[in-house]
Amino acid sequence: MEEYSWENFLNDKLLATNQVSAAGLASEEDGVVYECVATPDENNPDFDKWSLFYKEDYDIEIEDENGSKTTKTITEGQSILTMFNEGYASDGIWLGGTKYQFINMDKGLEYEGHSFDVATCAKSKGGMHIIKVGGGHILIVLYDEEKEQDRGNSKNAALAFSKELIESTDTGAA
């Protein structure tokens, strides 16, 4: 029997719903994405799915209320972990070099007998949900309003996947 990969699991259970444009799994240990899938960009022959989910540490310039500028180093995985620990992200969440505005955190969100911590973030014409699934996994899904995907349906698809992931991990299936 052929081994069922994380990539196949993400493709078959999330991307195939057409409710998300991309999905990735990150480690609860460091917040770094270790597997991802994405709908190909027909307008970009050089499209790389990893560019949506990972960028090496980088610096951004931040302006405070007095107009003073400072430099901040962005470590994407760490920003995700900090958001879960603190329950918010005042500077937003950065993923693949893109800034997402932190909208809210639902700690202990109940879904079909399971409890998840779910963060919702937005950007122009889209956004993402980040779900602490348990079992060492963090699920990240991106949705694109230009592809007729929306915040609610993408969140439901992500929660259904999270439930299936935690149940399959509990039984050793994934």
UniProtKB/Swiss-Prot annotation:
Residues the record marks as site: Interaction with Pro-rich sequence: 34
Residues flagged as site, Interaction with actin: 88
Cellular component annotations (GO), alphabetically ordered: actin cytoskeleton; cytoplasm
Classification via Pfam families: Profilin
Motif (Plasmodium-specific profilin mini-domain): 47-53
A single GO BP: actin cytoskeleton organization
Alphabetically ordered keywords of this record: Actin-binding, Cytoplasm, Cytoskeleton, Lipid-binding
GO molecular function: actin monomer binding; phospholipid binding
Region (Actin-binding): 99-111, 151-155
Region (Pro-rich sequence-binding): 4-9
Subcellular location: Cytoplasm, Cytoskeleton
SUPFAM superfamilies: Profilin (actin-binding protein)
InterPro entries from the UniProt entry: PFN (IPR048278), PFN_sf (IPR036140), Profilin_apicomplexa (IPR016814)
Superkingdom as given in the UniProt entry: Eukaryota
Family: Belongs to the profilin family.
Record's subunit section: Binds actin.
The record's note on its domains: The actin binding residues are poorly conserved between Plasmodium and other organisms. The Plasmodium-specific profilin mini-domain may have a role in binding to membrane phospholipids.
Function: Essential for the invasive blood stages of the parasite. Binds to proline rich sequences in various regulatory formin-like proteins and also to membrane phospholipids. Binds to actin and affects the structure of the cytoskeleton. Weakly sequesters actin monomers.
The protein's name: Profilin
Classification of source organism: Eukaryota, Sar, Alveolata, Apicomplexa, Aconoidasida
